[in-house]
Amino acid sequence: MRKFLVVLYTAFLIGANAAAADVAALREGDMKKLALHETPVPVPEVVLLNAQDGEHSLADYRGKWVVLNFWATWCAPCRREMPSLDRLQAALPDIAVVPVATGRNAVPGIERFYAEAEVQLLPVLRDPKSELARGMGVMGLPVTVILNPEGQEVGRLIGDAEWDSDSAKAILTALAAGQ
């Protein structure tokens, strides 16, 4: 029985690594910066605030794949990246694109940023004390993290990217399909 379990576990690992390799092979352009984890990483539970100071958390998105983006209104690369995140949300509505303004970002500034960038589909969420960012080891901005439906980190991209690129959409679609 033990030998059977070892063989079964080994086959599972080979299959899991092959699936990860298939997804990794889809990385082109900016997506080459995407680091995929071999083992999912737990994410801390932290209260996030919306524009009206209502409380939310990443648990609100359990059961869905999440593209979690850490950004700030003063961040120039974030300004370039945000419209592509909005277009990604339009292209892949079954995946939650969740931008979190980390640090001191006033709601009027966020709303002005969204208006200037023509962001229409993304929620306004804030991490005013940078608790989530610190808990996840975010040192600079922007940082985008991919969460599986269990709320665990499975990938991370440091810096800005074109999230509505064919490569990004192919990677996210493959992950969501269970590859």
Over which residues does each language-model region extend?
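Positively charged n-region of N-terminal signal peptides that target proteins for export
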Residues: 1-4
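Conserved hydrophobic packing residues within short motifs/helices of P-loop NTPase cores
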Residues: 66-68, 98-100, 145
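Short, ordered coil/turn segments that flank beta-strands lining enzyme active or ligand-binding pockets
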Residues: 51-52, 149
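Structural microenvironment flanking redox-active thiols in thiol-disulfide oxidoreductases
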Residues: 79-117, 128-134
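Thiol/disulfide oxidoreductase modules built on the thioredoxin-like
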Residues: 114-121, 127-174
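Bacterial N-terminal signal peptides
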Residues: 6-15
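Short active-site neighborhood of thiol/selenol oxidoreductases, capturing the structured segment around
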Residues: 56-79
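N-proximal helix/coil linker or "cap" segments that precede and/or mark the start of modular domains
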Residues: 19-45
